[in-house]
Amino acid sequence: MQKYTSEARQLLALAIPVILAQVAQTAMGFVDTVMAGGYSATDMAAVAIGTSIWLPAILFGHGLLLALTPVIAQLNGSGRRERIAHQVRQGFWLAGFVSVLVMIVLWNAGYIIRSMHNIDPALADKAVGYLRALLWGAPGYLFFQVARNQCEGLAKTKPGMVMGFLGLLVNIPVNYIFIYGHFGMPELGGIGCGVATAAVYWVMFIAMLSYIKHARSMRDIRNEKGFGKPDSVAMKRLIQLGLPIALALFFEVTLFAVVALLVSPLGIVDVAGHQIALNFSSLMFVLPMSLAAAVTIRVGYRLGQGSTLDAQTAARTGLGVGICMAVVTAIFTVTLRKHIALLYNDNPEVVALAAQLMLLAAVYQISDSIQVIGSGILRGYKDTRSIFFITFTAYWVLGLPSGYILALTDLVVDRMGPAGFWMGFIIGLTSAAVLMMLRMRYLQRQPSAIILQRAAR
């Protein structure tokens, strides 16, 4: 029991800074929305449309680079720290290549935006302008993620938290300058949010790079001179590990976007109630997602040390802590659901629907916690392909079709409206949780030599 208590303390010490960093990132999006809305409703809508395209594109790159964390954690645990610098440099090369692809996609996103049904031309122009300003921040964001993953792989999660709050503090005044045109800058409205956010990502990257260069604990990692050329073997391995994570993230984001589109014809009340419940659920999701990042670090580190039993302890402890957190957030959601909905909207119909959907959200929080921590465990074992197949099957083969049938058809029961899609979420997330656990058990039952051989690749 003592080893689980000790492991839980170490997991929480890693996870809490990640949670706070995520809060800062979420707050940046909130600030952009509020400040753009203060300028005009059209500008706020433009930022919302632009963000809905930016997120899937940049999260694809973000997911690809998540492969660095278990690689670095494993090298650190095995005492091969001299190889970390090379892996980080390959991460920067990969981030550079992906940045170019993301920037090309975002530059041409105007074709998608202008093809939207009945979109106002002025709104479309502002959304395109916002994206074309924001895309210059893509390299800064992805380079920052490489540096952050280096720190997190070395079990240092506080620098990411500090840089997140630094970004938030810089974002507010820079937004103000470019939205309203102060200090000789042009008045750009919502487009100014894109300029400000792009600048903030570069500030965060430069600050993180400065920390890494001056941190005593990383002196041995920056001994090698010169930046070096791309290593095709190392980059191929990073892509093999990262691509399934990137695709899983992409399909998860697009799933919720597709559901939002399917709910939109049902009416204003249904859309508003669905959005409130989804927004609050996303806030609660920060807790297990951050814990999953900590579990990846601990499992990777323990495997690097050559201890499959300690890796199992880290995995089980992470699941136990995650389930306890989910039970607490579920009780909180059920108890205060009406009060939470009232914070978003005071329309009685919207509040009633949002409160009903939050009951379903409370049910799936436990499954969601298990599946996302399970994903973190599998990343620690470097078993990322299964993450993609499980996620795709659970969400797109089981969850979405079930939700569609329950919400919009009479095949099983009378049409349930938005609640049907939320039942689909429960089916999809529960399926993912079960499959993740089965895969984890399969991996852990393999001979230690095979597990360690995979981890060392």
From Swiss-Prot:
UniProt GO BP: sodium ion transport; xenobiotic transmembrane transport
CDD domains associated with the record: MATE_NorM_like
Keywords: Antiport, Cell inner membrane, Cell membrane, Ion transport, Membrane, Sodium, Sodium transport, Transmembrane, Transmembrane helix, Transport
Subcellular location: Cell inner membrane
Pfam families recorded: MatE
InterPro entries, per database record: MATE_fam, MATE_MdtK, MdtK-like, Multidrug-R_MdtK
Primary location recorded for the protein, binned into one broad class: membrane
Topology in the lipid bilayer: Multi-pass membrane protein
Similarity comment: family membership: Belongs to the multi antimicrobial extrusion (MATE) (TC 2.A.66.1) family. MdtK subfamily.
Protein name: Multidrug resistance protein MdtK
Organism: Salmonella heidelberg (strain SL476)
